Structures are given as C-alpha cells and as structure tokens.
Design a protein with these regions (language model features):
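Generic long, charged, amphipathic alpha-helical segments
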Residues: 733-739, 932, 937-973
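Short active-site-adjacent structural elements
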Residues: 706, 775, 810, 888, ...
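Long hydrophobic segments that form regular secondary structure
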Residues: 576, 900-951
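C-terminal structured "cap/appendage" subdomains that terminate the fold
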Residues: 964-1007
Length: 1007
C-alpha cells in the first residue's frame, strides 16, 4: 500500500473495523489504501459500513512510517489496556467504538490546550487538554456532544481522558505535576518586593494554575472542561488524607535529596520554598536540559540554602559597613548629592559574595560598570578605596592635576588587593561613567546582551546585577517598560534570571553564589534582579512625595534591611545585641579617622581615580619624542607580497575570480613600488604586527570593506566557512591580528572597542563606521567618553575611528561623517599660537583631547596609523577616510614616502609649477582630503598650474599653525582661500577660519 495514503486512515473507519480484521495486522490495516470492511452481513449484500463527515482525513500522527510502532501499541493494548499510555488507550477505545476521523484521538494532559481553553501550553503539561485535530481547534459546537463520559457512539470524551488519567495516577499526583510548574512560573507569586506593595512583574493577579487555594468550585458557563478538571482536582487536594499520602518522586526533581518519596504536603512545602519564597527564578526558557537541571539542583536540593553562623556574621558585618557608610555621609554632608544606596544596601554584600566565589573559582580580574547610585559605597566597601580619598571629593579643593575632573559619583578606580575570604589576589576596576547609565556596559542594554555571545566580543560570561529600586527618578515602572520584568531582555540570550527580595540577605547571597558558579561553569551571562527600594528621592535633596506618595509613606514605615537582619540573627542566637552595636561602632570609628585625615588634604589628585592604569608604559619615555614611522623597503615588499598572494594551498583553496584580479593588481603595484589605500593600510597593520603590536579592526563589514576594497578575509568558494586571513601569516613570531565584522550596532560596539583600547596601550584598536554618518548612533560614546575621557577621568585611549566621508554626488545620506562636530569638540584655543620649537607638533598632540585628520594619500594614512603607536602617550584619532580615492588612479603613493626617515605630513605643500615661481601665484587654495584631486583637475583644465597653488592640510586638529604660517609666507602676493566640498556651516571652515587668522597674526585674511 502507498504510505502517503495513511493520512486517509479514518475516511472509511467503522466501529467494526478492528473486530473484523481478525489476524490481519491492525497497523497495516490502518495505513493500507481504501480498506474494505468485510463481514458476513456485508457479504450477504447488507449496506456498506457507515461513514462519518469530518473536516480531516485522519489523525495527524498516523502515517506509514509509524505502522510498526502503532502495531506494537495496539498489541500491547489488546493484552492489557493499562500497559499503554492513556492517550493510546483512549484512541484505541474510540476507534473501536467507531469514532469519526478527528475524534478518535483525545489529547492527554501533557499536550497543548484546545481552542478557548486556559492558555497554559507548556506551562501546564499536566493539565492542558482538549482535542486539537490536524491543528484545527475543536469549537464549542464540536464539544456539544461531549456531555457524558461516553457519547452515544461510545467515544470517550475529553474530560473522561483526564478523569481516566487521574484515576490511574491519582488526583494528588496530578496536582503535584501541576504545582511543579512553580519552577516555571513560581516567580510570579514569589514574595519579591520588600515593601510588599508591588509585584515585581507589575501584575498583582496570581496565576490560578499555581495557587490551589485560589481555585473556585463549580463550573462557570464559559469554563472549559480542562478548567473544570482543575477545580475538581483542587477540591481533592484539600482533603487531608490526600495531603498526607506518600508519592514517589519523579526523576526530574531534586526536592527529595536522598529520599525517593515524600508526602504530598512536604512536596508542596519544598516546592514553595524553592520557587515561591524570596527568590523567583526564570530559567525554563533556556534550551539546554543540562543547564536547566543544573539550576534545578541549585534551587531544589534540601538544605542547599543553609549557611553557617560564621557566614551569617560576615553578611551582617558587610551589611553594617554598607549601611554605616551611607549614614556617615548623610550626617557629615546632608545637603550634598551622593546618590546613596539606602534601601539597597544589600548590593554591597551581594557584589562581595560574587567576587569571593568568582575568586575561589579562578577569576583574577573583575571589571565593574555601574550607574552613579551606590558608586561611592562600592568604591569604599567593595574596592576598599581609601575613605579619606573619597571624603576629599566632598571638599571644594583645587586639583593637583590637569583636567576638569568629574563629580564624585561618576569616578572610577583600579585596585589590586588580597581577598581575605579566599586568600587570593584580585584586581578590581570600577569604570568611570557619566549619568548615561547604561553607556559603560557598553551600549544600550539590549546591545550589551546582544554582544554577549558574539565570537569577537564575548566576555565568556557577565554577571548582571540590577539594583531594581522600582522607580526611575519619578517614573513609575509601568510607564517605563512594556515587559513584566525589567530583566526580560536577558531572555533573548538564554541567560537565567534570579529575582530576589533585598530584605532577605541570605537568599541574596545564595543567588549570588549560583550566579558566580553559573558563569564559571557555562561561561554565559546571568542576571540577578535585586528587588529593593530607594529610601530617599532621586538625590538626597529631592522630594519623592510629590510623585510617589503612597510608596514613600510605606518606605517611611519600613525598617532598614540591617535592622531586619540584625533582629533575625539575634532571635536565632547567632549574635547578641552588644555584638551588633560593636560592629556598628567600629566602622563608625574608621569613618571618623578617615574624615579627620581628609580634612588635612589641600588638593584633589585626579590620578588617584584612574580606572585603567598602564603599568610601566610612561616610565623611561621622553613625553615629547616620537619614534620614526617610516620602515625599511624590504618590509614593505614582504608585507605587500604576502597580502597580495593567494592562500598557500591555492590549488585546494578556491577564491573568487574577482579576488584573483584584485590580488594580481596589488602585486603589480608592489612591483612598481606603489601602494593604493588598501595596500597602505595593510602595510601599516603588518609592520605593527611585526613589531609585536596587536592590531584589532572592528565594525560593520570591515573584513571585506564597505566598498569592497580591503579583503582581509578570503572565503573559500566551495567550502562553507573556510577562510584565509593573509595578515595573520606575515611572520612566524608576529602579534595577533583581529579583524571582525561587528553586529549592526554603533553605540555598543564603539564602546566595546574603546574599552579594549583602554586595557592595553600597546595595541592599535580601530573601529570603522560602515559610512561616516553612522557614527551619530554612537554619539554618547563619542561625546561622553572619547572626546572628554582624559579631562574628566585622567584616562588615555589610542582608539582610531575610521569614518568614510566625502560628497560623491549620491545625495545627502552617507556623504558626511560630520567633520564639523568632531572639530567643534576639539579642545584647543583658536586664539593661541603655541611657542614654536622642535617639539611643537608633539606638544600639540600631547595637549589636545583628540586628533582629527583628513588624509589625501595612502602614505600619510600609513604614517598616521603607525604614529598612534609611536607616540609616547595615547590620544584618540579621528580619520575622515575616503570613498572615491580608494580606487582613484592618482591617489597612490610611492615607497619613497613610506621608507625610513619619512613621517606623517601635517601639511602637504604645493610641489608643482606654482611652487617654482611663488611670487607669480595669484591664489593659494588651502584644502583637506579628497577635494584636492577635484581642485587639481580643475586647475589643469583651466591652465592655472603656475597661478594657483594648492596646499593640503592633512591634520586639521590640532591645527598646524607653524606650517600654515610658512606656506602663506611663500606666496606674499597671493589671495588665501579655504576650499572644501561641504557647505559653509559644515566641514572644517568654522574651525580653521579663526586659527588661520591666529597663524597669520591677523595680517592677512582668508576667505
């Protein structure tokens, strides 16, 4: 028989079918084509077997490939109906009773609910039910005949399946299966809010399928049968005899420990304790059975949350320090903004628990990004920043260093110390961050999560602690998010989420321990939602009663977490009231001594707050001396040929024909001692790799290049994911080269690269925008971190931003990298001409906040990249990179301007006919970037080569006053013009105009 015809199995099924099959295989009979029912009456000419109207041809699970299994089930059922699953039992009973196609099969309690039933789905595997035939919902009309246990045809109705199941398994066990769903939805009814006025999920309604005490009895007219069964089961549960019955525990739970069976009452008590107490855990969305079972074991194992008395005393001591620190600041500086941690003091013991456990598991360095709330407390009690340095920030003292500094609750620090709990050394860094709360993570929250498992961006597990004070300045959470929890974004990366009540310190410590172990075990993100409150306003002088009167009335009547936990330990006999008082007084004395020392300070030292120190980098270096950037020609040739050659196993590694042409063209350029833009970049990268400098290039499409010019990764044309990276194989002992296509994010990715550049000064870290105008979606990183990071936080960074820029006649989009914005944020005085000296150029670079260049030649691009590493300090470098020049025949450089004794040219002077007779020059055009080639072409077309000089300003900021002055002096009779392709209020004009006047001592005008 044709197997596909199995789907027509019930089209001719009759009540007599199984009986008349005799010795014929039932499964074969089901799937064979057009079965004919033969009986003695049929042979005698009695009318054929009755057929049933049905919207479906057969049950969806019946097909030829399942015939052996169906036969096995059927034979077992014939021997003993109870030996098969209840769903098979009901199916065989219904089919023998003559059920029409689509009605023989009734979904068991473990399958999805039918139309109009409680949408529990996988959340309620024990009680979902109803028939769903061929994915067509059973409507109310179809249910109409299912009134009694058996309909007139003898077909078992939907509820009868459940009742039959309950009879075999026992109603209390059915309830157990239901209640075990606490591990899925128990967090909805967990007691998470320390104030007891809100639900952490913003829903005050408790899911009835979890709370058996909430079930009502009787059946409403619109109640489905599966709901009705729930009511009956709930009623059965209330019988004490059922609650004391002992049940065998399934293998999927750890609540029994060494016990294999427990009374139902104890089962429910343990499940409530594990999932519905002060901890609510979301993890069943994780698509790994191993990881889910790991969390179950950490939550369900009896006694797993018990801790020793010494551990309780440690929690008390840490909580006392956190609370005492805020109280001391409030007493000494009552009117100062400090964004205290009152209401969430448990954050300090929580972070220390994470650090302790992580250190025990082998972690040596921990980097923390956080908002301003609680930052001072973290610096004091987690990092152990000297208290006198913190208290000095409250005094209006002058700075001993250059820079603007920043408010105290934005500052970071770096500490190396011994962890006394594990007796291991640990490096702790709190990264400075403005009030853009999520920026330091980096990026907006979703971007941070999105980067977590990308190969070139993963940290192999980040522990996210949310200080969830249930309010944002004055905004209610119901107006600030659409999801139930503020942590729901973590679901997209399969990160487990632990919600915990901050007024239960021991539960918080348990969750933190699990989080550290999870990260160490699975190298994945994990989230701790610390549900707390904010005892004061947004800051200490803000009045919260204006907007949250009910909440703050409750807060005023809520004792601090320290008082609650102290009382608990006193009641347990762990500590005495005298011991609690003694711990408080000792820390108070420590604060007073630090306060006395702080009052003796006369200056603030910004360097004390450096979050990313570079050990030994600045030692033994002349701060105003730059190493040469030119290299040997042999090195240029070697790198160029390696970069321009196909993979070594070219016979096996098939590259694209277009790539072959590109490689051939590059090789021809090398033979002629020339480079284009892509070759110049590759030679800069390769030469740094040779010198042991790690190079990292990141951004959207950087492996190929937005304009298909780079091709740093070659792809096999017939083997998926087989690649070759030529710059990784230049020298056997070279530094690593990382080129990575990023996610479609600028904010998060640029922030990541900035952080990467901060960790190691001996690395060239480049971020390239797909188009220059895309940098504006990372504006926060540019404004708050890159342009001002050193002034605010004494932090240097050598990050390079590559921004494709140029008006190519393709419309306004993707044309401008907004050069004017970067120049506007350059920190130099347009009216100040620095004293000229041999170190003039380097001193300018040292004093500026960042460097902005618009190169017009591959050689200058080569040199400026190498100069980033040659400098004895680090500054961000902003490069307006070209688009049309990538393949422009004139935009090429000779090896002669890249070899030894050559360097970056801040200004490229005129070297043509005009330079030979400068007194005859009528006009000098100063310009920057690719517009030079347009001007040069127009000059030649008009025959003005000897009348018009064109000077290129390659480095716009810091402005080359000395060289501009020299160039202008060459042409005393010429009119000075600044030429740019951008509009007057864009580009460089507004920046260079006053600086030209300063360079020329206001003696000549430039227009």
């Amino acid at each position: 028989a044709k197997m596909y015809k199995a789907r027509a199995v019930f089209s001719s099924l009759t009540p007599l079918a199984p009986r008349v099959c005799g010795g014929e295989r039932f499964a074969s009979w089901l799937v064979r084509s057009n079965p004919t029912i033969r009986t003695s009456k049929a042979i005698a000419g009695v009318e054929p077997a009755r057929r049933f109207a049905s919207k479906v041809a057969t049950e969806p699970f019946l097909n030829g490939s399942s015939s052996s299994y169906v036969e096995e089930m059927y034979n077992a059922w014939l021997q003993d109906p109870s030996s098969v699953h209840v769903s098979w039992d009901s199916f065989f009973r219904n089919s023998t009773a003559g059920a029409a196609p689509g009605f023989a099969y009734q979904a068991p309690p473990s399958l999805a609910p039918s139309y109009n039933q409680v949408p529990l789905g996988s959340l309620l595997p024990a009680l979902g039910g109803g028939s769903q035939v061929g994915q067509v919902p059973v409507n109310e009309k179809a249910r109409g005949h299912l009134v009694a246990d058996l309909d007139p045809l003898g077909i078992m109705r939907t509820d009868a399946v459940h009742t039959h199941y309950a009879a075999r398994k026992g109603a209390p066990e059915l309830v157990l299966r239901q209640y075990m769903l606490g591990k899925i939805r128990g967090h909805h009814i967990a007691k998470l809010d320390p104030l007891g006025i809100n639900s952490a999920d913003l829903d005050d309604k408790h899911p009835q399928e979890l709370l058996y005490s909430y079930y009502s009895f009787g059946k409403n007219p619109r109640t489905t049968y599966s709901q009705d069964l729930q009511y009956r089961v709930a009623a059965l549960m209330k019988k004490e005899t059922d609650m004391d019955r002992v049940f065998k525990l399934p293998s999927t739970t750890f609540i029994g420990g060494k016990e294999k069976s427990l009374p139902l009452r104890e089962i429910l008590r343990r499940l409530e304790g594990a999932y519905c107490g002060h901890i609510g855990v979301e993890f069943m969305f994780i698509n790994s059975l191993e990881q889910c079972n790991w969390i179950r074991q950490k939550m369900e194992t009896p006694g797993i949350m018990e801790i020793t008395n010494d551990e309780k005393r440690l929690i008390l001591a840490r909580l006392t320090r956190a609370t005492g620190f805020e109280a001391f600041l409030a007493r000494k500086w009552s009117s100062e903004k400090r964004f205290g941690l009152e209401g969430c003091e448990i954050l300090i013991p929580a972070m220390k628990q994470v650090i302790d456990k992580s250190t025990e598991l082998g972690v040596e360095s921990i980097v923390m990004g956080m908002p301003h709330r609680g930052r001072l407390n973290v610096l004091a009690n987690v990092c152990r920043k000297p208290l006198n340095q913190i208290f000095t920030q409250f005094a209006a003292l002058e700075a001993a260093d250059d820079g603007s500094g920043d408010v105290k609750y934005h500052l970071g620090t770096y500490i190396e110390r011994l962890n006394r709990v594990t007796n291991k050394n640990i490096r702790l860094a709190v990264v400075a961050n403005p009030s853009h709360l999520e920026a330091v993570d980096p990026g907006v929250v979703f971007e941070t999560m999105h980067l977590s498992d990308l190969p070139d961006y993963t940290t192999h597990g980040t522990i996210h602690i949310v200080a969830n004070n249930q309010i944002g300045f004055t905004t209610d959470p119901r107006h600030s998010r659409s999801s139930p929890y503020c942590t729901d974004v973590a679901r997209v990366v399969n990160a487990p989420i632990f919600h915990v009540n901050s007024d239960d310190p021991e539960s918080v410590m348990h969750v933190c321990k699990i989080a550290a172990e999870w990260r160490a075990t699975f190298h994945k993100d994990v989230v701790i939602d610390l549900v707390c409150y904010r005892r004061n306003g947004h800051n200490e002088i803000d009045e919260p009663m204006f907007t949250q009167p009910l909440m703050y009335r409750k807060i005023k009547n809520t004792p601090p977490g320290l008082d609650i936990y102290s009382k608990k330990l006193i009641d347990e006999g762990v500590v005495t009231p005298e011991e609690v008082k003694d711990v408080k007084e000792k820390y108070e004395k420590i604060c007073e001594e630090a306060y006395t020392n702080a009052r003796q300070e006369t200056h603030i030292k910004y360097k004390d707050w450096l979050d990313s120190p570079w050990s030994g980098f600045f030692e033994g270096k002349d701060p105003l001396k730059v190493s040469p950037t030119g290299i040997k020609e042999d090195t240029l040739v070697h790198i160029g040929k390696k970069f321009s050659s196909p993979p070594p196993n070219a016979a096996e590694f098939v590259i694209h024909k277009g790539i072959e042409r590109i490689l051939k063209a590059r090789m021809e350029m090398i033979e002629s001692r020339q480079v284009d833009w892509a070759l110049g970049e590759a030679m800069a990268f390769g030469s740094l790799l040779k010198e042991g400098i790690h190079v990292r290039l990141s951004g959207q499409d950087v492996e190929r290049g937005t304009f298909s010019h780079r091709h740093h990764v070659l792809h096999h044309q017939t083997v998926d994911k087989a690649t070759y990276r030529p710059l990784c194989y230049l020298y056997p002992d070279q530094a690593p080269y990382t080129v990575c296509n990023s996610s479609l994010s600028e904010f998060g990715v640029l922030g990541f690269e900035l952080g990467y550049s901060m960790t190691n000064p001996n690395a060239l870290v480049c971020w390239e925008a797909q188009f220059g105008d895309f940098n504006n979606t990372a504006q926060c990183i540019i404004d708050q971190f890159i342009s001002s990071g050193q002034a605010k936080w004494v932090r240097q960074s050598g990050i390079v931003m590559l921004l494709p820029h140029g008006l190519e006649g393709m419309g306004p989009e993707h044309s401008s990298a907004r050069l004017e914005r970067f120049l506007q944020m350059s920190a130099d005085d347009p009216d100040y001409f620095p004293p000229e000296s041999e170190e003039f150029a380097v001193r300018q670079l040292h004093d500026i906040n960042w460097i902005v260049v618009n190169c017009s030649t591959p050689a200058n691009y080569f040199h400026v990249l190498r100069r980033q590493i040659a400098l004895p300090f680090r500054k961000p470098l902003i490069i307006m990179t070209p688009k049309s020049l990538l393949r422009h025949p004139e935009a090429r450089s000779s090896f002669d301007v890249m070899t030894e004794d050559t360097q970056f040219l801040r200004v490229i002077p005129e070297d043509g006919a005009a330079a030979k007779s400068p007194s005859n020059v009528k006009r000098v055009l100063f310009c920057s970037g690719k517009v030079y080639y347009d001007l040069k072409k127009a000059r030649t077309e008009r025959g003005l080569d000897d009348k018009v000089a064109i000077t290129r300003v390659e480095q716009i900021s810091p402005f080359p006053y000395d060289l501009v002055k020299q160039e202008a002096a060459k042409y005393p009779n010429a009119e000075l013009i600044w030429s740019q392709e951008e509009a007057k209020n864009q580009g460089s004009w507004t920046y260079v105009q006053p600086r030209f006047s300063t360079a020329l001592s206001h003696s000549r005008d430039i227009s």
